[in-house]
Amino acid sequence: MFFIQECDKPNKISKMFNILKLEQDKIILPIDEEKLEIKKANKLAIKTKKILDIANCNKVIISKKIKEQPLYTNYLNSYNIEIVDGKWLFEVLSYKTIEYISKVKKIKEEELSVSILINKITETSLYNIRKIARNCKRVNIVTNHIELFKKMENQILDEDGIMITITNNKRKSLSKSNIILNIDFPQELLNQYNIYEEAIIVNIQGNIKIKKKRFNGMCVNDYEIQVLNDEEFDYDKEIRYNKKDIYEASMYKRQPMENIMRKIKRDKVKIVNLFGENSSI
């Protein structure tokens, strides 16, 4: 796997001829602060792909600055290059996100009303739903597939003795929720619901805007973590990259959720920031 980053002071020749620099596991682009135009972005993406093809690699982590170059990253995606973005890890850390909000906002977990927007059941989502249900006052599952989730509702009731609500009422489902955990609803669908105006909405897939004029809450689209062991983070990576991306890339995803959570606990991973469009907590 390679890391892709900007150059602090690219020389004129490198910029003119789009010369990429390779240092160990880092691909350094001949750009600094400027926004890339379409032609240059495509040339850099093509040259990046050639390096990755030679190394038989199709997964990369991009720096914070390169994330601000959508033309370049879109071209990488179009060439089937996987960009690690921390979204898989964000879903894994769903309950820890609830814990973090509870701590920062000084609201006890047992007083929280949480709605979870979800249409697809996975081992990860089931684990987090049960964890949230055990610790929060009220949990609503908002879904278009009520019958599918009724089975899960009965399973949680039988095994944990906890009642959750399965609903798809656009007028009432989200009207009293302190926290809305959006696992997989797209923006168009989410905006059809009546949302509590002071709610904190956590969008696992990111890049969602709430169009309600009366909404005064927070729409979280990104996050950052802290890790106990920072062997993966040399000085350059510590400054230029998001820890969440590097940590996600280190994880083996095809293993039982219990094993994943055991590693997260051992590494003392915790949420340290949640980022909205114009604010953070």
Q: Residue ranges of each PLM-predicted region?
A:
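Phosphate/diphosphate ligand-binding glycine-rich loop within oxidoreductases
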Residues: I46-V92
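Adenosine-phosphate binding glycine-rich loop
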Residues: L20, I201-I281
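N-terminal basic/disordered segments at the start of proteins
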Residues: M1-E23
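Glycine-rich phosphate/diphosphate-binding loop of Rossmann-like nucleotide-binding domains
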Residues: V104-R171
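Rossmann-like adenosine-cofactor binding region
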Residues: I162-L228
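Well-ordered, non-membrane alpha-helical segments in soluble/globular domains
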Residues: I38-I51, Y95-I98, S125-I129
